[in-house]
Amino acid sequence: MTFNPNIATHTLEAEGLRCPEPVMMVRKTIRTMLDGEVLLVTADDPSTTRDIPSFCRFMDHQLLGAQIDQLPYQYLIKKGLA
């Protein structure tokens, strides 16, 4: 799947934040979303390359794609069924 940020229904800019803040903000934002909606996260903390995929697995959300080749990193997360 090609990384396509245009499919996002919500966005979260977490640039400048450091662990654990980006994942905490992702969690807070996803809680306000409907099942199946897609969140685009933009971050520059290297720990997000590990923490966001782990968060998605643990919380049963789907990581649709990640762009981690250059800053800022971008992640597309589809909210799982509650």
Curated annotation (Swiss-Prot):
GO cellular component terms, A-Z: cytoplasm
Pfam families documented for this protein: TusA
Keyword Transcription: no
Top-level taxon of the source organism: Bacteria
Alphabetized SUPFAM superfamilies for the sequence: SirA-like
Key words of the record: Cytoplasm
Localisation: Cytoplasm
An MF annotation (GO) of this entry: sulfur carrier activity
Main location: cytoplasm
Catalytic residues (UniProt): 19
GO biological process, one term: tRNA wobble position uridine thiolation
Keyword Plastid applies: no
Its biological purpose: Sulfur carrier protein which probably makes part of a sulfur-relay system.
Family under the similarity heading: Belongs to the sulfur carrier protein TusA family.
Name of the featured protein: Sulfur carrier protein TusA
Protein's organism: Vibrio cholerae serotype O1 (strain ATCC 39315 / El Tor Inaba N16961)
Higher taxonomy: Bacteria, Pseudomonadati, Pseudomonadota, Gammaproteobacteria, Vibrionales
